[in-house]
């Protein structure tokens, strides 16, 4: 992370040093003259001399002023008289100082008022530029904060978009003109020079370390042509169409004749998403549950750990041990998948849930959780097909009726597929019109479908309906919080996350989402504390986590923690964030 002189900040518009030079080189003589008309004239005539008009110039001016003009035109004669009066005041004549830098330092704060042209650049550069330009004392910059979207207990950030960090509200409070201390420009120049030298040294080191690659013009032209073709929209469409045609050819005779249409859809969409690979178990020396006596069931121990509020990482190790005893343990795979997604380890959770469905294709809990994880990772069609498989398993009569009414359903795009599956869930919801018989899982599935279409108000209504049936469900409270956060209702989202954590204090995902919302409302220290708390829950007591727990690591917590430290302008803390860091070094300043 470079605060100055790196990346895009090296551009003319983005470099704080360049902006500073531009501000200091502006001609402020007119502003100085206006500011100095009241009271004593400042001693800064180095930029502007009080020259008297010669005879020839005065004659030209008189000729210009006395030309005939329309009666309604602006009269310049009174203004000329006023200008001459001001210009010939005895107090306005001072000896020109020889040292221009001393002259510049002696400027009064009121003479430095200017409105600099807005420049694009990083928040750090913008702050530096405003500091050096000496904006008016009453000016405050308050920008609407950007948001990284929270996960809906596994929801993807901002509907599949990458987490973007935007500038948070920064209020620059300045004293009144008569209270402002004089700026020590010599020290400012010295500091800027030192920063520039350091940036040049870093750039030189990076240049020396990077291998020197010489590319001739012909090769560069060929590469550019290929690159442009790869980035063209037509190439992307052709690639996707070709991939799907290849899939249809390979699967034409691969489906059994008696396979239901929804099963074919699930097989089609699930095969076109990325393969997350087999689940990676922790090393043997890291898992104390592998050494349990035969009469002790690690699966039951894992359930007890979850019920008693132990760390999710410890429960995950217990379920891993149960699976390593019996690799076909469906319930252990299900619980392992649920625990890892709640522990902010999405990919590990997906691998476990997929293995559960491989052993038990109609497991409704695994289907619902896997659909949400697919949404979080951006595989919408796979999520919709998984939800259709869920409702086909729990409400087969609804799906069969829909197939009979439209036997030639071949939805290819995500919007048509979403609409089709949403109609199935709405039909299922109509089977239970009153709250007493309402299916909370149907409401949750509807909420996921509306969330994928960014219909957050409907999503919130669905999750609230589900909570009316299961008010003590921490996962539902977390999902409600994520929906509220994506509706720009961060304060309400914080309340929902706190409710989830009251019910389940070890819920790492809710703690992560809470940290994100705290950043969005400008509570950076609180955000850091929640994120550090989540990271501490990834550690297992009695195990050297730095050297042993190397699998299924999550980077979302550490990356968001970096953003919190950047917002706090704490580069010293930012440099401490790295893999396998010692969290105790933060305990002196943060409570977690």
Swiss-Prot record:
Keyword flag Transport: yes
Source organism, top-level taxon: Eukaryota
InterPro entries named in the record: PEX5/PEX5L, TPR-like_helical_dom_sf, TPR_rpt
Annotated spans, Disordered: 22-49
One function term, GO molecular function aspect: peroxisome matrix targeting signal-1 binding
Motif (WxxxF/Y motif 3): 185-189
A GO BP annotation: fatty acid beta-oxidation
Gene3D superfamilies in the cross-refs: Tetratricopeptide repeat domain
Motif position, WxxxF/Y motif 1: 100-104
GO CC annotation, single: peroxisomal matrix
Domain comment quoted from the record: The TPR repeats mediate interaction with proteins containing a C-terminal PTS1-type tripeptide peroxisomal targeting signal (SKL-type).
Subunit (UniProt): Interacts (via WxxxF/Y and LVxEF motifs) with PEX14; promoting translocation through the PEX13-PEX14 docking complex.
Record protein name field: Peroxisomal targeting signal receptor
Naturally occurring in which organism (per UniProt): Candida albicans (strain SC5314 / ATCC MYA-2876)
């Amino acid at each position: 992370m470079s605060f100055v002189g790196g990346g895009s900040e090296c551009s003319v518009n983005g470099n704080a040093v360049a902006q500073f030079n531009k501000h200091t080189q502006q001609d402020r003589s007119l502003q100085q003259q206006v500011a100095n008309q009241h009271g004593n004239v400042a001693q800064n005539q180095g930029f502007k001399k009080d020259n008297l008009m010669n005879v020839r110039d005065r004659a030209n001016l008189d000729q210009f002023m006395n030309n005939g003009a329309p009666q309604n035109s602006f009269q310049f004669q009174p203004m000329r008289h006023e200008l001459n009066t001001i210009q010939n005041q005895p107090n306005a004549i001072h000896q020109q100082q020889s040292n221009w830098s001393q002259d510049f330092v002696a400027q009064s704060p009121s003479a430095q008022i200017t409105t600099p042209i807005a420049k694009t650049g990083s928040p750090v550069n913008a702050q530096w530029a405003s500091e050096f330009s000496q904006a008016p004392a009453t000016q405050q910059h308050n920008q609407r904060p950007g948001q990284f979207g929270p996960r809906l207990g596994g929801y993807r950030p901002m509907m599949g978009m990458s987490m973007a960090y935007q500038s948070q509200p920064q209020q620059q409070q300045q004293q009144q003109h008569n209270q402002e201390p004089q700026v020590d420009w010599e020290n400012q120049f010295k500091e800027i020079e030192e920063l520039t030298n350091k940036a040049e040294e870093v750039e030189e080191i990076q240049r020396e370390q990077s291998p020197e690659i010489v590319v001739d013009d012909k090769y560069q032209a060929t590469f550019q042509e290929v690159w442009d073709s790869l980035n063209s929209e037509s190439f992307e469409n052709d690639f996707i169409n070709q991939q799907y045609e290849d899939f249809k050819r390979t699967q034409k005779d691969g489906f059994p004749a008696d396979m239901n249409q929804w099963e074919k859809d699930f097989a089609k969409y699930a095969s076109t998403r990325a393969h997350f690979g087999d689940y990676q178990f922790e090393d043997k020396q890291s898992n104390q549950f592998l050494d349990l006596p035969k009469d002790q069931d690690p699966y039951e121990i894992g359930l007890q750990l979850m019920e008693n509020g132990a760390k999710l990482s410890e429960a995950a190790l217990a379920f891993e041990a149960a699976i390593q005893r019996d690799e076909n343990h469906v319930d252990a795979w299900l619980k392992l998948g649920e625990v890892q997604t709640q522990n902010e380890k999405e990919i590990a959770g997906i691998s476990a849930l997929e293995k559960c469905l491989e052993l038990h294709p109609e497991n409704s809990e695994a289907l619902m959780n896997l659909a949400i994880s697919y949404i979080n990772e951006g595989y919408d069609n796979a999520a919709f097909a998984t939800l259709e498989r869920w409702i086909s398993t729990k409400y087969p009569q609804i799906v069969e009726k829909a197939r009979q009414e439209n036997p030639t359903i071949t939805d290819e795009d995500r919007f048509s597929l979403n609409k089709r599956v949403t109609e199935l869930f709405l039909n299922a919801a109509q089977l239970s019109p009153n709250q007493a018989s309402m299916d909370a899982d149907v409401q949750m599935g509807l909420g996921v479908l509306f969330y994928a279409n960014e219909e957050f108000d409907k999503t919130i209504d669905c999750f609230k309906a589900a909570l009316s049936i299961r008010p003590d469900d921490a996962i539902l409270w977390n999902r409600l919080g994520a929906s509220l956060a994506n509706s720009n209702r961060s304060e309400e989202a914080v309340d929902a996350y706190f409710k989830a954590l009251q019910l389940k204090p070890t819920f790492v995902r809710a703690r992560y989402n809470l940290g994100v919302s705290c950043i969005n409302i400008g509570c950076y220290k609180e955000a850091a504390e929640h994120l550090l708390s989540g990271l501490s829950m990834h550690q297992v007591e009695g195990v050297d986590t730095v050297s042993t727990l190397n699998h299924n690591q999550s980077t979302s917590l550490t990356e968001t923690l970096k953003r919190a430290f950047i917002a706090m302008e704490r580069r010293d803390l930012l440099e401490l964030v790295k893999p396998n860091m010692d969290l105790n070094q933060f305990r002196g300043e943060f409570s977690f």
